[in-house]
């Protein structure tokens, strides 16, 4: 069997990171960050990430600011991002797509939808 695909989960709430890893199972390798600043620092040293699951509302650097940074360094062209948030406002969701997110998953999580969307995005890249 080949190497596991690597998913970075960026969320300031550890419980949300744990839930996502539990939903997705041991099929993937995981890297965790508590905010966009930490995630960007990690990406500067390791671009072998296959997918980023990115929360919007976080301290230090939020999800939108991280997407802007990823655009600046052209990482957004290489690493797909799925935004995760409980936010339902259309303008927030649209902003995620405009900044380069491939998809948007709302909390509370539906396990089937999370697994399917993650697999669909990974199959495209």
Describe each PLM feature range:
Residues 59, 107:
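A Lys-centered signature of the CheY-like receiver
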Residues 32-51:
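Acidic, metal-coordinating helix/loop segments flanking the phosphotransfer/catalytic sites
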Residues 13-31, 44-45:
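Two-component/phosphorelay signaling modules centered on CheY-like receiver
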Residues 58, 70:
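Receiver (REC) domain active-site loop signature in two-component systems and cognate sites
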């Amino acid at each position: 069997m080949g190497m596991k695909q690597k998913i970075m989960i960026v969320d300031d709430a550890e419980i949300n990171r744990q839930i996502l890893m539990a939903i997705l199972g041991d099929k993937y390798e995981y890297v965790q960050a508590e905010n966009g600043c930490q995630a960007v620092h990690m990406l500067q040293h390791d671009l072998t990430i296959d997918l980023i699951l990115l929360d919007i509302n976080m301290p230090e650097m939020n999800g939108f600011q991280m997407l802007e940074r990823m655009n600046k360094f052209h990482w957004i062209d290489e690493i797909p991002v799925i935004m995760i948030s409980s936010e339902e406002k259309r303008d927030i969701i649209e902003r995620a797509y405009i900044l380069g997110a491939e998809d948007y998953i709302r909390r509370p999580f539906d396990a089937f939808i999370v697994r399917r969307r993650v697999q669909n995005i990974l199959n495209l890249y």
